[in-house]
């Protein structure tokens, strides 16, 4: 745990480096932090911060730059940051100006977020997290060949052929359909798999068919995310070397980046921050990722976020991602006829 003085010095280093993108000297820290101490004390504190892994000094005669651990300490102190009221009003106004269509909202979201953070923003289309049974129908085609029709919540229809052991009549299939509808209405595939029902061999085949169709729907890849703001990120000093710019461009062109920056996480409307080495994918461990989910739990959930170098304007990014996820959750709730999220106007 850092002392209060060390924390003030670390925050000064992080803030100045984020703003200026050059190593921070002891004299700059002394001018910025407002502590009544001498330069020698600053230098001693800087050495301790380096030993403990919070900062890096490329050369001992040069200034300090934050390490991932230093950024993490800084970010933890920003958990409750919010957008200014005027900015919230402006964002609401912008959303009221566009058509009430999901693609319009998503395009506006990434445009606003990337402009505010001056980095690349991403948002995914909200999709159902787990399919739920709405209705099951079994149709006799010929002899023992049966068509299993599954209607999911949201009116998605799936169907699959199943061979029964013996010839079965349509009235018998209707009885099985009714039994399964009573048992499985509103359930996810996980709940169906765990629900004991005492099924016979043919009914188990139907159950397996239902689970297979629902798994395919659950695992179906969502549409490619909406991106904006690549030009902001490439203007940062970290990308003045062509190699790094080419690497991020290749990830975008090969459609790898979308999978890397939309990590699976439980829906909680909270903002998650992944700094440098905290990212699961080795290819983005020189970056920071700030993401949040939005939408309606268990019905329609998307992801909104921003990616950029670890030298990111975290305060702006956290507040913008948090507020835009709230705005999008409210819009999705209204679209689905649900109670709106607190608009926090």
UniProtKB/Swiss-Prot annotation:
Known function: Negative regulator of class I heat shock genes (grpE-dnaK-dnaJ and groELS operons). Prevents heat-shock induction of these operons.
Gene3D superfamilies assigned to the protein according to its UniProt record, in alphabetical order: 3.30.450.40, Heat-inducible transcription repressor hrca homolog, domain 3 (3.30.390.60), Winged helix-like DNA-binding domain superfamily/Winged helix DNA-binding domain (1.10.10.10)
An individual GO BP term: negative regulation of DNA-templated transcription
Gene: hrcA
Family: Belongs to the HrcA family.
InterPro entries linked: GAF-like_dom_sf, HrcA, HrcA_C, WH-like_DNA-bd_sf, WH_DNA-bd_sf, WHTH_transcript_rep_HrcA_IDD
Keywords attached to this entry: Repressor, Stress response, Transcription, Transcription regulation
Molecular-function annotations in GO: DNA binding
Protein name listed in UniProt: Heat-inducible transcription repressor HrcA
